[in-house]
């Protein structure tokens, strides 16, 4: 798998150590259970209210699930959540060509991808979590958040 190689950026390793990879696990913590209780959820790891943002696989349609057999609810927020199912762009020949990737369904996430979950509806939302460059306190800043999960390939695409 190319996404595990250091010379191409070790995207898998970066994801594995990220909060996204641990998004499902965190639902078992006392903090998550307390947050869930505030919105009427007794078991966060079993509730769609929580899983819709804490697990990519939870959101797959049956059609997509048939194509993506290796993605589990327990995987947390995985690649497909931000980049779309990789079935049609996962080959090396396509991955090396950005235009072909996009034609195959690869998504290069925009702010709206992030704010589907990072928003005021989250029970752990903090309106002052980030400080913008101009000193304003905001609940989410895509530039800072993206920097925390950046996983570029040092080998530039065509």
Cite the ranges covered by each PLM segment.
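Sequence context of c-type cytochrome heme-c attachment sites
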Residues: 1-75, 80, 86-109, 128-158
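Repeat-solenoid scaffold signature
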Residues: 106-121
């Amino acid at each position: 798998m190319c996404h595990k190689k250091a010379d191409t950026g070790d995207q898998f390793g970066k994801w594995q150590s990220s909060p996204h990879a641990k998004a499902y696990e965190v639902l078992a913590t006392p903090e998550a259970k307390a947050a869930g209780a505030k919105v009427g959820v007794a078991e966060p790891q079993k509730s769609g209210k929580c899983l819709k943002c804490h697990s990519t696989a939870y959101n797959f349609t049956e059609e997509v699930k048939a194509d993506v057999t290796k993605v589990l609810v327990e995987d947390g927020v995985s690649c497909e959540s931000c980049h779309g199912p990789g079935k049609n762009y996962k080959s090396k020949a396509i991955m090396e060509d950005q235009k072909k990737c996009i034609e195959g369904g690869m998504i290069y996430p925009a702010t709206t991808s992030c704010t589907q979950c990072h928003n005021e509806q989250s029970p752990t939302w903090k309106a002052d979590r980030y400080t913008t460059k101009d000193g304003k306190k905001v609940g989410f800043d895509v530039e800072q958040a993206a920097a925390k999960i950046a996983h570029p390939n040092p080998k530039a695409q065509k």
